[in-house]
């Protein structure tokens, strides 16, 4: 064993004159992501959460996916913003667990 500049022991095979064991010539990084929601359909209109809600589908000439956003409650349930807004006009609770509704976040 040899000792490096900081006083740590290093194997003698890793001394400066030895050839490298391998060299990284190319590295392809891959990243994955996922939503923090279990169900990917809006429980109010039953459309996929990333598709237009039924209100936006009815007005498809003027609606875009940027206008049809997703809203999460503090209970972590997600709905189309238009759907949950319409629901909250009559009841101030989550449609799935009946807890008082508070927005956690909304957007894409």
From Swiss-Prot:
The protein's annotated pathway: Protein modification; protein ubiquitination
A Gene Ontology molecular function term of the record: ubiquitin protein ligase activity
GO cellular component: Cul2-RING ubiquitin ligase complex; Cul3-RING ubiquitin ligase complex; Cul4-RING E3 ubiquitin ligase complex; cullin-RING ubiquitin ligase complex; cytosol; nucleus; SCF ubiquitin ligase complex
A Pfam family assignment: zf-rbx1
CDD domains: mRING-H2-C3H2C2D_RBX1
A GO biological-process term: positive regulation of neuron remodeling
RING-type Zn finger ranges: 53-98
Gene3D superfamilies xref list: Zinc/RING finger domain, C3HC4 (zinc finger)
Sequence positions that bind Zn(2+) 3: 75, 77, 94, 97
Subcellular location: Cytoplasm; Nucleus
Knockout mutant characteristics: Severe pruning defect in ddaC neurons. Also shows defects in ddaD and ddaE neuron pruning and in ddaF apoptosis. RNAi-mediated knockdown results in apical detachment of scolopidial cells in Johnston's organ.
InterPro entries the UniProt entry points to: RING-box_E3_Ubiquitin_Ligase (IPR051031), Znf_RING (IPR001841), Znf_RING/FYVE/PHD (IPR013083), Znf_RING_H2 (IPR024766)
Protein residues bound to Zn(2+) 1: 42, 45, 80
Keyword Methyltransferase applies: no
Binding-site positions, Zn(2+) 2: 53, 56, 68, 82
SUPFAM superfamilies: RING/U-box
UniProt entry keywords in alphabetical sequence: Cytoplasm, Developmental protein, Metal-binding, Nucleus, Ubl conjugation pathway, Zinc, Zinc-finger
Tissue: Widely expressed. Expressed in embryonic, larval and adult tissues.
Family label: Belongs to the RING-box family.
Description of its domains: The RING-type zinc finger domain is essential for ubiquitin ligase activity. It coordinates an additional third zinc ion.
Subunit structure: Component of SCF E3 ubiquitin-protein ligase complexes consisting of Skpa, Cul1, Roc1a and an F-box protein. In larvae neuroblast self renewal and asymmetric division, as well as ddaC dendrite and mushroom body axon pruning, the complex contains the F-box protein slmb (SCF-slmb). Interacts directly with Cul1 and Slmb. In caspase activation during sperm differentiation, the complex contains the F-box protein ntc.
Protein role: Core component of multiple SCF (SKP1-CUL1-F-box protein) E3 ubiquitin-protein ligase complexes which mediate the ubiquitination of proteins involved in cell cycle progression, signal transduction and transcription. Through the RING-type zinc finger, seems to recruit the E2 ubiquitination enzyme to the complex and brings it into close proximity to the substrate. Required for the specific SCF-dependent proteolysis of CI, but not that of ARM, suggesting that it also participates in the selection of substrates inside the SCF complex.
Record protein name field: RING-box protein 1A
Species name: Drosophila melanogaster
Name of the gene: Roc1a
């Amino acid at each position: 064993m040899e000792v490096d500049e900081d006083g740590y022991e290093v194997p003698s095979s890793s001394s400066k004159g030895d050839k490298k064991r391998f060299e990284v010539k190319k590295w392809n990084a891959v990243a994955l992501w996922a939503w923090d929601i279990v169900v990917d359909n809006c429980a109010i209109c039953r459309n996929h959460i990333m598709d237009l809600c039924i209100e936006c589908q009815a007005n498809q000439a003027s609606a875009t996916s940027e206008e049809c956003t997703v809203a999460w409650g503090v209970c972590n349930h997600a709905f189309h913003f238009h759907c949950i807004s319409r629901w909250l006009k009559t009841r101030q609770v989550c449609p799935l667990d009946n807890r008082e509704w508070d927005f956690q976040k909304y957007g894409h």
